[in-house]
Amino acid sequence: MAWIGTHNPELLSFTPSGTSDMSIEQVNAGEIRVAFFSNEFPHDDLGNLFRQLHIHSNDRRHLLLARFIHEATSALHEEVRLLPNALRALIPPFETIFNLVDHEALRNGRLGGAINGALLCAVQLATLIGFYEDQPNGHSEDTDSVETLLAGLGIGLLSTAAVSLAPTLTHMPIAGAEVVRIAFRLGILVDRVSEHLQPRPPHDDGHGDSWAYVIPDVTAEEVQRELDEIHASEATPTASKLFLSAISQTSVTISGPPARLKHIFLVSDFFRSQRFVSLPVYAGLCHAKHIYNKDHVDSVIDTPSLEALDAASAPRIPIYSTNTGKPFPAKTSKELFHLIVEEILTQAIQWDKVVEGILTRARDVQASGCQILVFRNSLPVHDLMAGFSGLDQIKADTLELIPWISKPDQCPTVPSGTATSKIAIVGMSCRMPGGATDTEKFWQILEQGLDVHRKIPADRFDVDSHYDPEGKRLNASHTPFGCFIDEPGLFDASFFNMSPREALQTDPMQRLALVTAYEALERSGFVANRTAASNAHRVGTFYGQASDDYREVNTAQEISTYFITGGCRAFGPGRINYFFKFSGPSYSIDTACSSGLATIQIACTSLWAGDTDTAVAGGMNVLTNSDAFAGLSQGHFLTKTPNACKTWDAEADGYCRADGIVSIVMKRLEDAERDNDNIIGVILGAGTNHSADAISITHPHAGAQSYLTRQVLSQAGVDPLDVSFVEMHGTGTQAGDAQEIISVTDVFAPTKRRRTAKQPLYIGSVKANVGHGEAVAGPTALLKVLLMLQKEAIPPHVGIKNTINPGFPKDLEKRNVNIPYQKQPWPRTPGKKRIAVVNNFSAAGGNSTVLIEEPPAREHSDVVDPRSTHVVVISAKSKVSLKGNLQRMIAYLEANPDVSLPDLAYTTTARRHHHNHRVAVATSGVAHLKKQMGSYLPSVETHRPIPSTGAPPVVFTFTGQGASYRSMNLELFHHCSYFRTELLELDSLAQGQGLPSFIQALDGSHEQDYAHSPTVTQLALVCTEIALAKYWESLGVRPDAVVGHSLGEYAAMHVAGVLSANDTIFLVAQRAMMLEKNCKTGTHKMVAVRASLDEIDSVAEIASLAESRGVAGVRPFEVACINGPRDTVLSGLSKEMDEVSDILTRAGFKCISLDVAFAFHSAQTDPILDEFEAIATTGALFQPPTLPIISPLLGKVIFDERTVNANYLRRATRETVNFLAAIESAQKTSTIDETMVWIEIGPHPVCLGFAKSILPTVNAAVPSLRRGENNWQTMSQSLGTVFSSGIEVRWDEFHRSFEKHLRLLNLPTYAWNDKNYWIQYNGDWALTKGNTFYDAEKTSKAPSRVPVSAKHSSLRTSTVQHIIEETFSATACTVVMQSDLMQPDFLAAAHGHKMNGCGVVTSSIHADIAFTLGEYLMKKLKPKAKDISMNIADLVVTKGLVANKNTESPQFIQVSATTHDIEAGVVHLEWRNVVSGEALAENFATAKLHYESSGDWLKTWIPITHFVRSRIEALEGLAADGFANRLTHDMAYRLFANNLVDYAQKYRGMQSVVMYGLEAFADVALTAEKGGVWTVPPYFIDSVAHLAGFVMNVSDANDTENNFCVTPGWRSMRFAKPLIPGGRYRSYVKMIPTPEDPTVFLGDVYILQESVVIGMVGAIEFRQYPRILLNRFFSAPDDSSHLHSSTSVAKPKQTSSTTTSQAKSVPVTVPELVTATVIPTEPTPVEAAAPAATKGVTVEVKVDSDSTAAKAMALVAAEAGLELADLEDDVSFGELGIDSLMSLVIAEKFREQLGVVVNGSLFLEYPTMGDLRAWLVEYYS
């Protein structure tokens, strides 16, 4: 046999090419090899052996091993399917045959013989196959004369059959699988027959009693004689007779039913007197010829697969019979198996005969040596070695195969396919509770052992109204606690091309998934399409999400355009794919609490299946819906105590809900290593199953968890005892924690296999720190483990608040299971990897497990990067972010002054996405870099981004001769493999033409002034330029046009596609050689003159020189080059040129003699022209140009295929190079323009200066090389400039030659330009939902509430008309009043404050109600109280109360006043409308009333009085000087009425007003007129306070023509002294816009009496709205006409006594869709509504522009929630976040509001703002 040897020299044999510590030794001629297969397992840990073999099978070097395992598993599956149900049920599911080794009960049970037989064959054959695959030339079929013999015992004989039948190693998997099948079938037969002889006791999980005893020091005859006597005397049935199963010279083995074996040792004196040992034979009888017959044998081997094998293979190596000691005489496979099975079943073992047979064969062939292959040494091998020791001429030794399995790999493992790869995690990011906005802050929470639970924040919902600790109120939560992300609405909408409106309506968890995905990708160094594994078509996204809170609650309050796309789960990962342009799959997965980890498992599966090469995965959860809290409370899931999860605590009562967003980036390990990624952790295996046998769907099941864990460990080939940390699910529920600890200890710390002191197992659960993130719980746990691996520490567990759960095993310490109560070190250990398990299960029954190990250790590279200068770049999508990124980088450099500059450059260039705001610094040191970065900070605001219209065009300009040293030493040649390869290939082409090598002119072989031949010099120049051009192109910089100067034109022609590289070299060399041959050096000269040709001609001495030569009128020189307006090169005889140079120098012109051998473009070249043209005609092929060629010869641009030919080259050699005319012509034809980037291709920049002198503007101009400067410095600076101009540089190519030694740094992530996009859930409709519970609640509490009528309560005022309910205790009470707005005094008060012609219940009326109820409660609870002073605080009116038109029907409101403790001095008030006799659940106003001391108020106001008086005096001065407006009583109220509010006479208390901007004071006189019953008359309050409203609606500092302002409330209202009829006061206010929202204004109104502040309305708020909404906001509720009224703007009336300034461009707030301070009572119409956005998002609307284009721009800005300044001409609609959905909306509004009819594809046809603006101007102006 080729791979192991043969018994016949004519057959092929394995011959290794070398030896190793564990290899087949070279066997010389005449030597033999014996392979022995035992009938016992090796003494090693079987589980570990099988795990190691499984790991080897995943290696590409062991494809045959993998195939054998697969074939053997398939064979066993087939056989199991054929078993009867009763037996089949005993065998658990198994993925591979190796899984069965861990099922101890199965191997000891009834089918133990079948299972162990199959496993023994499997381990022997797998070891043999793997061993030979690992050998050098392991598949060799070279011949040798080695003779191989096979021997085995018992089942081991079956293994020998596979070896004998396999002609090559590649045949072993099929033959081996058949052996495994027959071994299993044999075991089944033996069990069935033996069961008839002695049944196994029922429910016996042990291995039972032995069926064989060995008796030493007796002969077979003695034993047989005694047995015969016993059988005869007892009349033993034949089948039950004991028999000899093995015979040797020193012992005899007897076999039979265990009971009969025991019996004979009791009844027989002979046997009682013998020593004996019971053998581990528990599966039944073999070697029993009196039991088994041919039919039995046939039943074992009669399989279709053996028939197929029989046709393909025949025995090739002799197998020695253990009965005869001779080879089996089989000719076919079937015969061989028949003989072997027959021998195992019927023949006694006589090993001595085998030893003698092998020794005889060794003597016969006169062997000089013998190598014995064994799995482990054993007694039979010892006997064989002893036999050989008696043969002096034969030296024998053994080679154990088992040690190969665990030997260290000399080479790194290469997966056999994607399915066997490990998964590397290369990037991670998060947003976690407790302010953890990144992974480092998350680690700080873990490391410090923090519990970050808190009360449910107000931005989610009002916890006070939605929480009921008693659990009686419908839809209320039983807990007020959770763990929450800070400000989950923060988002950089413009970065992700989303409009503010879309961002607002998009679920914040989906937004944060997008953000963290970017950060994780950024940290992973992901750049799309950089490598094969980063191909965008092969990247998928996988996210777990189990709730839609924001869609269900927040956006559902006002469903708009993005309700579906912003809220449905599928759009989360879909949006990530869309933004990054990933074409791989995107999955949103919901498996409840295990969603995130199950998703990561699915992502791993996608990578293993080869569906994707990179996966972005994670989980997300942001809690805003009180329903889920209520539902989980009702299901008894949630803890009621103030803590995160009390994991493993004795009092654990449920989990604490949590937010969280986690994103990770995964690749197959080999791809990650190939891509030079940072590997954070390695996933070895992952799996998901279901707790099908749990007692309920929500109840966890330890058995299912254990099964899954074992399955994952088995797949990965990991010993459970090698796992040192388990991150448990640990929700803090009694059932969950108890079940999980059972599964964990059962697998990782079993009682039967103890952990040693050096194998501690730590357990933990992150939920004790940050709560249970539900869908993100698993990724959060995984993130914790990754950080533990990174930080080399285990953080403390903080879940046990009291004592440990009593249900936990009491022997955790004995099992070495540890709970880390303090931080524990977890360092790397040489030779042993840290391995952890993340466990996760779900209330829906799912279990997910991920097995993770530490990343491979990376060796530090000592290789020094040879590049002298490096490019570090910073980019961003906005100026704010650019500044932030610069600041973060500077901070990083300050913290890491020793950072590797090459690594930093590599990370910021090749491993980052780049954006339109760019900064690039070429630097050689960190200190310089930090200084340069800092210098950019002050100019960020003026920094211009690159155009969004695309990269600028590029022109390559190729240098002519004379610009470099005679000999160069190019660093690029030495260090850049791409450039070097290009030059060497060109040099090879040159040498192939018989030309000299030009490399010596470039590689530093000579000094700089060493002069090479013109041929070498010119070839070196042109080839260097070609290589440089190719190098630039490899960096992604491709020319749009080329221009060559003189000799440089040859390189330009090649780059333009006219000449091949070979032809270019040919022409350059031929021309140079002709010059060398036909022209003398030194006779002519070229001189560069800093002057124009006209200036040169004007020099008198030049003309005189010509005359003196007798050639008057003819120049004494030739014009070689016209390079620019004042750059000219002259050629001629050396002597004449020296004279010309002297003359011009004296005339003041700078002259430089060029270092060239010949005077090109002069008469010196005439001798070569004919010959050169002829050879160019025949020797070169001219192709059409692929790029425009700017021709200095012709002074024009060449586009056609006819112009460049041999004659062109002739003329170019002789005639003038007119670079000036060429560039001017290119400019006229628009071949070049001011946006062009100029790159000089040559040894030194020359042409760039020419171009700059010719063109008025040059975008950027950079050289490739610069004389006297390190190439890397030049290239780095040039690349930085090119990159900053907008060209996308292939930085990965720039670093390719050095990447092996470069490292990706963990730099700060992107600095987001965040704004808070958040729709607030308002009210309590989640509680009520149309149910009657809360109505019934009022009824159910009726006994404690005493309905009162007039006789019970005497309280009657105009606004507080009836007390309908009241409840009083000693210190607490609730009072509910009901009033009819149609009651005359109340209605008069409302009509005294008319807006839009409607009576409006002003805030002063609400104040009177509050004062009245406050006074009533105080007198009831504390009747003796005196001097009651009340502060109405935090008044918030969410909806205006407008009086009905119909005054005949009542219009009721109810106001409740509640205090829980009057001693606390706080009363809570709520206003509600009454419909159909029932108060609405939703209030329209709220306030708090505080009982305070008026004396204390007066004291606090004393310091402010001086300031207020000084401001009043200043306003008086401004009015006196004519700067401030002084308005009379009538004028003031006429303006007020014209602009917004028409006050009744009693309200008109302001006698005069002085106003300057938004600051004013008024003299006030309160009316003495009486009418109505009030506590504080509303017209008094209004008179002293409505100055603020007057300023906001009348001042010319506001755009009152297009906007109006209303107040939703104030922070406080206090009157230290009563307002008295006829009293005189002075009011002062200054309103100030808030920084967060310029449409919201705040101010304090001070009320003075006799120059003393006696009252104050603090922080009164006004909001600005478009006047177009006035009709909608303020119309009578019972008047439907306003719904159909015109939408034209209601402008203020003009009066003759006032002047108005021109309306200014003012910022108009985009009102929130849902807000706590919205005034309107009805929804706004679409055409009049301003769009939704967040605070601070403004739109600059220039109201004085009447053009359709301007209006359209304003409409676009308003709809998208942008500023007009954002609508720059080159900005695309995609960048603004205007997608197809919004484009339809805008198109419709164009039609409705502007009369511009467009279709929905408008923004495809006109993709930028400039395009749209131009179209509108053209067609609608």
UniProtKB/Swiss-Prot annotation:
Residues 420-854 form the Ketosynthase family 3 (KS3) domain. It holds the Pfam family PP-binding. GO terms for biological process: fatty acid biosynthetic process; secondary metabolite biosynthetic process. Its EC number is 2.3.1.-. Its cofactor is pantetheine 4'-phosphate. Residues 1357-1676 are annotated as: Product template (PT) domain. Residues 46-284 are annotated as: N-terminal acylcarrier protein transacylase domain (SAT). Residues 1361-1671 form the PKS/mFAS DH domain. Non-reducing polyketide synthase; part of a gene cluster that mediates the biosynthesis of a yet unidentified natural product. Multidomain protein; including a starter unit:ACP transacylase (SAT) that selects the starter unit; a ketosynthase (KS) that catalyzes repeated decarboxylative condensation to elongate the polyketide backbone; a malonyl-CoA:ACP transacylase (MAT) that selects and transfers the extender unit malonyl-CoA; a product template (PT) domain that controls the immediate cyclization regioselectivity of the reactive polyketide backbone; and an acyl-carrier protein (ACP) that serves as the tether of the growing and completed polyketide via its phosphopantetheinyl arm. PANTHER family: FATTY ACID SYNTHASE, SI:DKEY-61P9.11. This is Non-reducing polyketide synthase Preu7. The gene is Preu7.
